[in-house]
């Protein structure tokens, strides 16, 4: 089963709706809920239950990609936000607009701009990425989009530098067939493949890399792989996209490390950065989150945090 593809649950009375279905009270269902198919789809997750006398602990990392990206790029103000358990969306808006921003306080209206900028712009995204992320539907105007991109990049110069440092390393490695390194990431060419070695020692591989020209007439990297059409084809990439690959791969390695530190637990599922653990009622949620949030020895200084909740059936909190 692909847990990540299950519909999310937003019903405020999820438990009550679940009980109605369990007891077969379909008349009450029809009376209480306008959209029965939607209600039933939201209950699919709740079909997964722990054994008798057990519970689920569902824990995930807090903003893991943003933390890894900030750490690799050495964007210190962001790492300071994470160190103090701050709100990265507020902090980002504050850095972008030069004013204090509080979630439910001063300049709270700017937090939404900080949020969409964080979600859309970390890997080289621009106006198009903001639009795809729903910026216009959130109330932003088209005239605000480019200034938002410019503000985010000005507030995060080290991340921007990281994108293009990776871009230079990849191109130099492909062109000259030599090893390069930046920000603790090692790049090398071997047997017709580009390899990117991560801090964990794991490698990303790109088949038959070469230099090409993108639709804007600029130099770009091209390699072979499974594209959006699910067919083997030529794939174009560049620095920020490679950074996305690197950050997401490191985030995956951190999850794998957490699973090993929690190997004494019964991990019955994991989705993206989330672990689903079946355990006895006396197991502490805080203890699980503390263990999950431990930094692997191969990436010292990275600040991690895990949060979670307990439930007697699977759901999104």
Question: Which role does the model predict for each range below?
Answer:
Residues 1-317:
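Conserved catalytic core of nucleotide polymerization and phosphodiester-bond processing enzymes
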């Amino acid at each position: 089963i692909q847990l990540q593809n299950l519909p999310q649950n937003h019903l405020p009375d999820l438990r009550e709706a679940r009980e109605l279905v369990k007891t077969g009270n379909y008349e009450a269902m029809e009376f209480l809920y306008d959209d029965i198919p939607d209600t039933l789809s939201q209950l699919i997750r709740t079909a997964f239950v722990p054994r008798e006398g057990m519970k689920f602990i569902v824990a995930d990392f807090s903003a893991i990609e943003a933390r890894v990206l900030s750490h690799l790029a050495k964007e210190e103000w962001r790492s300071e936000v994470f160190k103090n358990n701050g709100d990265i969306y507020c902090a980002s808006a504050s850095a972008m607009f030069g004013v204090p921003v509080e979630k439910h306080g001063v300049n709270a209206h700017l937090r939404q701009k900080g949020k969409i900028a964080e979600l859309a712009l970390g890997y080289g995204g621009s106006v198009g990425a903001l639009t795809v992320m729903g910026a216009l539907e959130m109330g932003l105007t088209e005239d605000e989009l480019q200034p938002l991109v410019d503000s985010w990049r000005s507030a995060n110069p080290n991340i921007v530098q990281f994108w293009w440092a990776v871009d230079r390393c990849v191109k130099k490695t492909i062109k000259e067939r030599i090893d390069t390194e930046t920000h603790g990431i090692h790049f090398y060419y071997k047997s017709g493949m580009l390899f990117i070695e991560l801090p964990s020692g794991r490698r990303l591989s790109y088949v038959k890399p070469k230099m090409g020209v993108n639709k804007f007439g600029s130099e770009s990297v091209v390699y072979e792989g499974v594209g959006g059409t699910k067919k083997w084809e030529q794939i174009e990439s560049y620095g920020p996209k490679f950074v996305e690959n690197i950050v997401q791969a490191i985030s995956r390695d951190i999850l794998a490390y957490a699973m090993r530190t929690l190997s004494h637990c019964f991990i019955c599922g994991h989705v993206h950065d989330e672990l689903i653990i079946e355990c006895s009622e006396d197991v502490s949620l805080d203890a699980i989150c503390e263990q999950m949030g431990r930094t692997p020895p191969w990436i010292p200084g990275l600040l991690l945090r895990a949060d979670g909740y307990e439930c007697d059936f699977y759901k999104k909190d």
